[in-house]
Amino acid sequence: AAAMDFSHWINLKVILEELQLRGHEITVLVPSPSLLLDHTKIPFNVEVLQLQVTKETLMEELNTVLYMSSFELPTLSWWKVLGKMVEMGKQFSKNLRRVCDSAITNKELLDRLKAAKFDICLADPLAFCGELVAELLNIPFVYSFRFSIGNIIERSCAGLPTPSSYVPGSTSGLTDNMSFVQRLKNWLLYLMNDMMFSHFMLSEWDEYYSKVLGRRTTICEIMGKAEMWLIRSYWDFEFPRPFLPNFEYVGGLHCKPAKPLPEELEEFVQSSGNDGVVVFTLGSMIQNLTEERSNLIASALAQIPQKVLWRYTGKKPATLGPNTRLFEWIPQNDLLGHPKTRAFITHGGTNGLYEAIYHGVPMVGIPLFGDQPDNIARVKAKGAAVDVDLRIMTTSSLLKALKDVINNPSYKENAMKLSRIHHDQPLKPLDRAVFWIEFVMRHKGARHLRVAAHDLTWFQYYSLDVVVFLLTCVATIIFLAKKCCLFFYRRFCKTGNKRKRE
């Protein structure tokens, strides 16, 4: 398995642990350094990829991307957004190239991996190179991820049908019920991502993959060989859309029943009485906020009767109320599953959102970047959440959102409806993910699920050759009909006129 950081690793680790329980031997390729991954604590065989970069440099780059995505991009014109995205894409590609080089150029590592005779490779399509390693080892591979920006990888490399008229592009924050202007925005988002991905990222990686494999190929061709695509979503909060046989929703695979809280934490929760508690976290990637924003948030939290558990490692806000307690870490799943939890204030990360759905907890969303605006847009459309824009948020707007979610019973009812749908599945998400991985291992692939779209050129895929042929036929018929009419007109009409004159 090729590991990525943060939520990507959290989900992959759950799958790997289940596979290990079923008797499979696991080896994980881990870059060093990593921001969240500690390769000394990973309970599997580990191959560390040594990089010539420090953890501090990675954190600095991450903070720059987070700030730009959360606060700069929403204020820029679309052409400036395109420029910034190209800039971030190139930096992201540079980081991926470092990791890939450390694996591909390590002959001893590749020899060990070949000698191990693995049955399958689990990879993340956002971390280029997992599929290249699988190709070099001549083994099938399965992808696990949430989505790519604008669904560009799924559309271009997997052939996933994505009509822009009702399938909102990822990171757009749109729903499936779009106005004309929103459909225009969605169409332009797809176009912009196609241009950026094709012209500023793919060409470089096409050349790299061709050089490594010793034959002319493209990264999309190699990605398209994925046997299964395990997507961290599900129909409980996803909008209906076309799908492919080798795509499977496994959202919430990490969710589980709540465990009892530590004694001190349980005492704090019980002290809330009938008012209950609110759980607040902006995830593992946001370590702190500006003093102004943290005081604004603390002031709003101080005005609700509920007790608040706030995961926050920044400076203690001056406006922090007696009902609010700060924690460096909280047992989030166990708190969301507690009967006294009334609401969840979240950035909208997929993992936390699915834990809230699993336990039926309504949400106040403060989306920042990546998949978060999309996630919050979905649960908001389902009536289980309200959203607040961190850039323009005020104490009163956050307070109003909290009171609405806590006091309006419809939010809780809709959250419970999503929870019931999530639990009413023929197979649990984790079991479904493991089933398909083992299916690919048993059958050495799943090519019978692979659509023929991979074998078509782009103009064949859109039937443009058929359209051109039909238009040519119509034009030919019109041309011949016109010529025939002119011929008969000249042959008979002019002859008749000539006889009359005689």
From Swiss-Prot:
It catalyses: glucuronate acceptor + UDP-alpha-D-glucuronate = acceptor beta-D-glucuronoside + UDP + H(+). Keywords: Endoplasmic reticulum, Glycoprotein, Glycosyltransferase, Lipid metabolism, Membrane, Microsome, Transferase, Transmembrane, Transmembrane helix. It is a single-pass membrane protein. One of its GO terms (cellular component) is endoplasmic reticulum membrane. Its main location: membrane. The keyword Transmembrane helix applies. GO terms for biological process: lipid metabolic process. The chain crosses the membrane at residues 466-481. Glycans are attached at N177, N288. Its EC number is 2.4.1.17. SUPFAM superfamilies: UDP-Glycosyltransferase/glycogen phosphorylase. Signal peptide: none annotated. The keyword Transmembrane applies. It is found in: Microsome membrane; Endoplasmic reticulum membrane. GO terms for molecular function: glucuronosyltransferase activity. Pfam families: UDPGT. Belongs to the UDP-glycosyltransferase family. UDPGT is of major importance in the conjugation and subsequent elimination of potentially toxic xenobiotics and endogenous compounds. This is UDP-glucuronosyltransferase 2C1. It comes from Oryctolagus cuniculus.
